[in-house]
């Protein structure tokens, strides 16, 4: 039960971080309070950091909200491609 509660809290914090309702530092402090400063806490903080700096919602090479493509169309007129969590204009995946 405790593991399920921890996972639920973590997913809630990820949702809050990706919506930018709170800043990354406050969410990482909550992770320290709930999970602690151990290996699992470090992993959780790394995931929150990766999602918080994800500006165009690219997840695993997929443009979830089409914001990468929209950004690239406005900026350079080229198609936007997600490379992991980064958006690159006019550079398709080579694999």
Swiss-Prot record:
Family membership noted in the UniProt record: Belongs to the long chain scorpion toxin family. Class 3 subfamily.
Gene Ontology CC annotations of this record: extracellular region
Keywords: Antibiotic, Antimicrobial, Disulfide bond, Fungicide, Secreted, Signal, Toxin
Disulfide partners: 58-82, 68-87, 72-89
Full protein name: Opiscorpine-1
PROSITE patterns cross-referenced by the UniProt entry: BSPN_CSAB (PS51862)
Function in brief: The short synthetic peptide (20-54) has antimicrobial activity against the yeasts F.culmorum (IC(50)=8.8 uM) and F.oxysporum (IC(50)=10 uM), and the Gram-negative bacteria E.coli.
Alphabetized GO MF terms: toxin activity
GO BP term, example: defense response to fungus
Xref: InterPro entries: Long_scorpion_toxin_alpha/beta, Scorpion_toxin-like_sf
Subcellular location as annotated: Secreted
First and last residue of the signal peptide: 1-19
